[in-house]
Amino acid sequence: MLVLGACGDDSGSASQGEASGGRAAPLSLTLTESGCDPTSLSAPAGDVKFAVTNTSGLKGEFEIISATPEILTEEFLDDGASGTFTVPLKAGQYQVICGAPSNTRADLVISGEGEAAPEVKVDQGELDAAVSSYQGFVLQQTEDLAASTKSFTDAVRAGDMAKAKQLYAQVRVPWEQIEPVAELFPDSDAVIDSRADDFPKAEEDPNFTGFHALEYGLFAGGSVDMPSLADRLDSDIQNLITQVKSLEIQPQVMTNGAAALIEEAAQTKITGEEERYSGTDLVTLQANVDGANKVFVLVSPLLATTNEQLDDDLAAQFRKVQQTLDGYKTADGFEPYGQVSEADRAKLKTSMAELSELLSQVTGSLGLQVNQ
């Protein structure tokens, strides 16, 4: 887990120097209302230390992305959260996203050789086949998302609130299942799946679009009169399909993304923050678990040859998480999240955190590069 925070820097750029005793001083970065401060960062290759604080007044997302693009680290920060973290980076050019993807980003230049990345330990042909299968899965899920969402948005446009509310949770499942790689298309993520917390005016902000804006109107606002939001969602998902068709997913993106998704679920989604208006969080959590499990199933035969114990532990941990979720299944889905006891929420949080920790070991166990 990456723990974030610390103080900002008033200058336009920052470099990693040395602290007392020869230790590398962390790069200081502030998440402001408009984005990153400073907007230019540099450090030598290797374990790069960061110190970040969020003063934006909103819950914010912090990410480092490579030119691939590949998400190298991401974290959600409450306003005022602080801390330090370290991430291994090879020489190259990166970008830092502070808050919304449209905010001012920071350019990060990593120079020098640094520590060499590990060699792939598994059969390259089998690894390529697993990645190809996953890429096909992501495209199929995205196309399924477009079709199912069209039924939902048609109900909104027709003014059929009962049908729209009935369809809402299930049409989101394909999206939630591909979230291990959703940050490869951050602009689509921002317009399809953003929360009201991401915007200065919350639910009343004109830039609040996507599933959760429609969820708010249906379940909290008591209105189905949202044809423009419905049209925008259909259009944004079509744009997503175009992006997915041209993606080349790297294996470490799959494995790191699965771990990051379950970590996010354990830290934030478990609180009920995502589906706060509809109470359909168990559907979302199940889809996230299924999405991470898809990655695991594809790499499991390879993992069994390099770290059989980890492979066994992951299979057992997925079963453990599923057992808790199964306790709240109904004939047509899941009980509302408000029905989940505090004890079971705590159990889910713990078991999903343990699952995330195990998943975070897969990339290294397969001998994959942490970043490219």
PLM feature segments, named:
Residues 69-75:
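Surface-exposed loop/edge segments in extracytoplasmic proteins
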Residues 39-58, 83-99:
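Beta-strand cores of secreted/periplasmic/IMS beta-sandwich domains, seen most often
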Residues 61-65:
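Beta-strand signatures of extracellular beta-sandwich domains
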Residues 116-372:
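Mature extracytoplasmic or organellar-lumen-exposed domains after removal of signal/transit peptides
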Residues 28-31, 77-119:
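Extracellular/periplasmic metallocenter environments
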Residues 22-44, 147:
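N-terminal edge beta-strand
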Residues 7-28:
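Short, low-complexity, disordered segments immediately C-terminal to signal peptides
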